Curated annotation (Swiss-Prot):
Domain of life: Bacteria
Primary localization class, coarse: cytoplasm
Annotated residues for binding of ATP: K279
One cellular component term from this protein's GO annotations in UniProt: cytosol
CDD domains in the cross-refs: CysRS_core
Protein name, UniProt field: Cysteine--tRNA ligase
UniProt binding sites for Zn(2+): C42, C220, H245, E249
Any one Pfam family match given in the protein's UniProt record, by short name: CysS_C
Catalytic activity: tRNA(Cys) + L-cysteine + ATP = L-cysteinyl-tRNA(Cys) + AMP + diphosphate
Length: 477
């Protein structure tokens, strides 16, 4: 544990308060085990290239993890990968690719995006397909306890069997709509799917009730408990997951007799024109497209600058304002380095700690950082090098918690997007190979579809005598 962590307090003495969706209020964070924190973050369904809406949750809860770790907590942080899903199967089939190859390709894309933005790698990153045994065991427990039933190869959760169903989202049982469509095997259309019976051409696994594949809600429960146990501290994800996904996770865990998550944290969406950023709405901004406008550290600063529970309305003006703010911090630190000497990481301020302990109030924490920058610049201009160095050291400590310390070697080159673009090149080359195969078999529609998808992601393909070449599409700044 560092001296600066000891100065603020560690373990249960930290004073951290978090908004718990289940309670509908801010609560003191009291971990299940003193000095330890167990966190599960719902990760990506790897069906396509990540956009900034996808990675916001990664950035938001990376700050929580960094704050806990810096204050002496031993943090187990699990982020799953959903690598089997209707959308993955459909998109892979449309592209003429094996489903597992499609999922693995975009899993790498998400890993590259998280890494480009400085999100710490999780303690473990389980794939759904690697935990089928645990899912089957969970479903068997639910059937044995009378909370689930098999019908025609499918297995459903009996919503009416659980009196507290709807406690997270506040949905009354009469208002529940699972969004699964009508299924003939359901006893009640409010029931949700735990296991889907095998269909021709789809992957399947053997179970006591026949071959099939897992339902989305079952995947996360099994992986949570496999890595964190039947009860753990924090379950996190986007606010769009509150219902039905997280509600249905709770139903399964409680139906099986497990305590499950003690705190539920949800981040707000990234919006454009007031609408949630979504591929179905066509208003997404892929990570490669944004990284052609700003550096990775600047994008991280932007995504983390709003309170994690608030909506983050994307606009070019807001993005450039974040760039200007980050550059101001960076320039001050470089001024101190050039005039005074290298800047060590010092201690954060009490106001910064109070802000993060108040439900991760990053906007207030950033205000403290910019106040320190202003004071440091004044000190530097007046020749007070000691004060300037003190402020710079404090700023480094605070920016390090936010994951974007400009003097960290990850960002210091001022060209931190290069690694991300190398990762993008791997993905684009795979797409171009798929396009070439489609052209060879004269499937012009498939070839054009691949080219169009790349263009939507901000990548332009030009056919040359030496083969297809790609470049990032120039955007107006």
């Amino acid at each position: 544990m560092t001296d600066r962590a000891q100065a603020v307090g560690s373990g249960p003495e930290l004073g951290l308060r978090l908004y718990d969706t289940m309670a509908g209020a801010v609560r003191d964070f009291v971990p299940l085990r003193p000095g330890h924190a167990s966190i599960y973050l719902c990760g990506a369904t790897v069906q396509g290239l990540p956009h900034i809406g996808h990675v916001r949750s990664g950035v938001a809860f990376d700050v929580l993890r960094r704050w806990l770790t810096a204050n002496g907590y031993d943090v187990a942080f699990i982020r799953n990968v959903t690598d089997i899903d209707d959308k993955i199967l459909n998109k892979a089939a449309d592209a003429g690719r094996p489903w597992w190859e499609w999922a693995a390709t975009f899993e790498r894309a998400f890993s590259a995006a998280y890494d480009a933005l400085g999100v710490l790698p999780p303690s473990a990153e389980p794939r759904a397909t690697g935990h089928i045994t645990q899912m089957v065991e969970l479903i068997e427990r639910l059937i044995d306890k009378g909370h689930a039933y098999a019908a025609g190869g499918d297995v459903y959760f009996d919503v009416l069997s659980l009196p507290d169903y709807g406690q997270l989202s506040g949905h009354r049982i009469d208002d529940v709509h699972q969004g699964e469509g009508v299924a003939t095997g359901k006893r009640d259309q409010r029931d949700f799917t735990l296991w889907k019976g095998a269909k021709p051409g789809e992957p399947s696994w053997p179970t006591p009730w026949g071959r099939g594949r897992p339902g989305w809600h079952t995947e996360c429960v099994a992986m949570c408990e496999a890595y964190l146990g039947p009860e753990f501290d924090i379950h996190a994800g986007g606010m769009d997951l509150v219902f039905p996904h997280h509600e249905n996770e709770i139903a399964q865990a409680h139906g099986a007799g497990d305590g499950f998550a003690r705190y539920w944290l949800h981040n707000g969406w990234v919006t454009m024109g007031g609408e949630k950023m979504s591929k179905s709405l066509g208003n997404v901004l892929s990570i490669p497209a944004v990284l052609q406008r700003v550096r990775a550290a600047e994008l991280r600063y932007y995504l983390g600058s709003a309170h994690y529970r608030s909506m983050l309305e994307f606009s070019e003006t807001a993005l450039q304002d974040a760039v200007k703010a980050y550059t101001g911090i960076e320039d001050f630190l470089h001024r101190v380095c050039s005039r005074v000497g290298s800047v060590p990481i010092g201690e954060w301020t009490p106001k910064f700690a109070a802000a993060l302990n108040d439900d991760l109030s990053v906007p207030i924490a950033l205000a403290e950082i910019h106040a320190a920058r202003a004071e440091g610049n004044r000190a530097l201009d007046s020749g007070d090098h000691q004060t300037a160095m003190q402020q710079a050291s404090s700023i480094r400590a605070m920016m390090d918690i936010l994951g974007c310390d400009p003097l960290n070697e990850r960002w210091e080159s001022r060209d931190a997007t290069s690694a991300a673009l190398k990762a993008v090149d791997v993905l684009v080359q795979w797409a171009l190979a798929s396009r070439a195969e489609a052209r060879e078999r004269r499937d012009w529609a498939a070839a054009d579809a691949i080219r169009d998808r790349l263009k939507e992601a901000g990548i332009e393909v030009t056919d040359t005598a030496d083969g297809p070449q790609w470049a990032l599409i120039e955007r107006d700044k």
